[in-house]
């Protein structure tokens, strides 16, 4: 029940909940200033979200909306890789929906748009696209080890094809 209470507080922009969230983020950043470990959790959904933002030319959706859709995509990818359950993905979807956040990319965005734009992400290293995946709820890691078939299936599903 506490997650539902906190969720309601965040969705109504409760000042304490927002302040506490900012403090948690600051603590995570301080614990991992070089983005080598636990800080990856803060980037969950950003590879997909940044592609959405770029596709929309940084208009129509704010950063958090793009990252919201990206977070669900990252969770779905994590499930396809066997790290989190379908039920956990459904829980993430429900939380995002209850906050009125997008859970799918713009309808006009296609698989090739994602692939092209994701190659521009700051996490690309030596030409290898890296994404943040959930190893479990609350635990994330940056990886380049995502089979192309899993990524393509995710993008096709997200883009309605």
Predicted regions and their residues:
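Short amphipathic alpha-helical interaction patches enriched in hydrophobic/aromatic residues
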Residues: 25-33, 52, 56, 75, ...
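C-terminal charged capping/lid subdomain of soluble metabolic enzymes
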Residues: 83-161
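Internal helical hairpin/lid segments
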Residues: 49, 53-91
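Single conserved hydrophobic/aromatic residue that forms the stacking wall/gate
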Residues: 1-12
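Oxyanion-binding "anion nests"
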Residues: 13-60
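Short alpha-helical scaffolding segments that buttress acidic/His motifs in well-ordered protein cores
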Residues: 17-25, 71, 96, 118
